[in-house]
Amino acid sequence: MLVISNVYPSNLFTLINPFFAKLPEAYAIFDPIVDVMPIIPVFFFLLAFVWQAAVSFR
């Protein structure tokens, strides 16, 4: 496995750290949407608490 990871050292950094990954140029207009997408599950988690508060935590 060590040999395989050393074959492409320039791509290894982007595979380990996805925060620095870039979208292809054709999809650059979707970059702001892609930045917000990981937060969407947190909104559903918070919505569950709001929903339970609305029904008095039954």
From Swiss-Prot:
Cell compartments where the protein resides: Plastid, Chloroplast thylakoid membrane
Residues spanning the membrane: 29-49
Membrane-related topology note: Single-pass membrane protein
Biological-process GO terms, alphabetical: photosynthesis
GO cellular component terms attached to this protein's record: chloroplast thylakoid membrane; photosystem II reaction center
Record has Ubl conjugation as a keyword: no
Propiece residues: 1-21
Quaternary structure and interacting proteins, as annotated: PSII is composed of 1 copy each of membrane proteins PsbA, PsbB, PsbC, PsbD, PsbE, PsbF, PsbH, PsbI, PsbJ, PsbK, PsbL, PsbM, PsbT, PsbX, PsbY, PsbZ, Psb30/Ycf12, at least 3 peripheral proteins of the oxygen-evolving complex and a large number of cofactors. It forms dimeric complexes.
Family recorded in the similarity comment: Belongs to the PsbK family.
Purpose: One of the components of the core complex of photosystem II (PSII). PSII is a light-driven water:plastoquinone oxidoreductase that uses light energy to abstract electrons from H(2)O, generating O(2) and a proton gradient subsequently used for ATP formation. It consists of a core antenna complex that captures photons, and an electron transfer chain that converts photonic excitation into a charge separation.
Descriptive protein name: Photosystem II reaction center protein K
Origin species: Psilotum nudum (Whisk fern)
Gene name as annotated: psbK
